[in-house]
Structures are given as structure tokens and as C-alpha cells.
A protein has these predicted regions:
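A penicillin-recognizing enzyme superfamily signal
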Residues: 17-220
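Mid-domain, small-residue-enriched loop/turn segments at the edges of structured enzyme/sensor domains
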Residues: 1-25
Length: 222
């Protein structure tokens, strides 16, 4: 991240102005087992005869442990399973879709069933919509907004990242998977062999407490 990051408590809410270029690089460190690889626009230049004029050499740096990177990816997988990115997976019958799904969420349903880690983002007054999506060998970022933040959607239903930016990612990835020559992974993210941080939260609940919670849910008809 090379842009100015203000030293304020609200930084956790996403107050800095960052580019898609920077965001993709940052998220790439999670997908690359903690290794940052600086994004580049040009990987190779050849002349008209095919002779190599320029070959990009990746700039890399270890920034976090492979363990921390994997746990973060595991958390972000939850976004597409249970959170604001879950519309990448589910398929609401057409007759049951609300106006947002019928008229706004372009390309729905996407019906992905592979491992996807992601994060939606929405700024103040729905001026910016974000979606950052990761599969094991590809990180893609989508930003929707305007140079002037006075230009924005009036409601969160239309202006949130899950409605503005996520559909672009979904359509793009469907096209990527249609072209098998690209080799975009549908495999699971690889966990480090020495993973010591528990990621199965249910396993940490005492058996008696877990059982009582199940009974409570049954009592609610769930």
C-alpha cells in the first residue's frame, strides 16, 4: 500500500482512498501464503520478430506468516458462504426473487460451488462499491464509483458492494471458468502443514454446551 493511510481508529472501516491496483496486491499476499507479489501491468514485450525486449521480474516480499494468511483466507471464505457474498453461490427461484435480484443484480444466478474467499465493501452514502474475490491462483478486484462522491445511489439496496461490484466479479469469473485454457483453479485453498490456529469453531464449544444449543435450535423449529 503506497497511498496515504490516515492514523485514525476508523482505519478498520476502510477510510483510506486506495486503488484497485493496491488492493489486489494486498489481497494477493493472503492467497500467496503470506508473500506479497507487486502487481504489474506489463509482463513481457517482444518485437515484430518475437525477440524478447523486456521480461518482468516479480517483486516479492514476505509480509505475514503462511499460517496467518490461511486463517485470513478461511475467514474470507465465510463471506461467500454465509455473508454478503453468498449470492455468488445460492440460486433463488425466479418467482421468489425481490426487485433487487430481478432488476439490479446482473448475471444472477452465478452458482459457484468452488472455494472462493472475498469481501464486499460499501463507503459512506453508497458512493463506492467494492468486491475483492480470491481463488487459489487468481485475485480480482472490482470497484464501482465516480470521481465525485456526490454521485451515488440513494439506497443501500442498490448501492452496496454486493449489488454494484460483486455481479461484475461473478460474470467475469464465469467467463474465466468457461475458458479452461486459462487454468483458473477450482480447488480448495491449501492449508499450511504446521497450522496451529484452530479454525473449526464448533469443535471448541464444550460438548454439553454444544448439545444444549442444538436443543434450543430444535425448539425454535430449526
Amino acid at each position: 500500500i503506497e497511498s496515504y493511510v490516515p492514523d485514525v481508529p476508523a482505519i478498520a472501516l476502510g477510510t483510506p482512498d486506495l486503488s484497485v491496483f493496491e488492493m489486489v496486491g494486498a489481497y494477493g499476499a493472503f492467497a500467496n501464503q503470506g508473500i506479497y507479489v507487486k502487481p504489474t501491468m506489463i509482463t513481457r514485450i517482444e518485437d515484430k520478430n518475437g525477440s524478447l525486449l523486456y521480461q518482468s521480474v516479480p517483486e516479492t516480499k514476505d509480509v505475514i506468516s503462511a499460517e496467518s494468511a490461511y486463517v485470513t483466507v478461511n475467514l474470507l471464505e465465510g463471506v461467500t458462504k454465509f455473508g454478503s457474498g453468498a449470492r455468488l453461490r445460492h440460486n433463488i427461484p425466479e418467482e421468489d426473487r425481490n426487485p433487487v435480484y430481478r432488476d439490479v443484480v446482473t448475471g444472477y444466478p452465478y452458482s459457484f460451488d468452488n472455494a472462493i474467499a472475498g469481501k464486499t465493501g460499501t463507503t459512506q452514502n453508497q458512493s463506492d462499491g467494492w468486491f475483492m474475490g480470491m481463488v487459489p491462483n487468481l485475485v480480482t478486484g472490482v470497484w464501482v464509483g465516480a470521481e465525485d462522491r456526490a454521485t451515488h445511489f440513494e439506497t443501500i439496496a442498490y448501492g452496496q458492494g454486493a449489488t454494484m461490484a460483486l455481479p461484475i466479479w461473478g460474470i467475469f469469473m464465469k467467463k474465466c471458468y468457461e475458458n479452461e485454457e486459462l487454468g483458473i483453479s477450482k480447488e480448495d485453498f491449501i492449508a499450511p502443514e504446521d497450522l496451529s490456529i484452530p479454525i473449526d469453531c464448533e469443535a471448541l464449544i464444550p460438548a454439553e454446551e454444544n448439545s444444549s444449543e442444538a436443543k434450543d435450535l430444535e425448539g425454535l423449529g430449526l
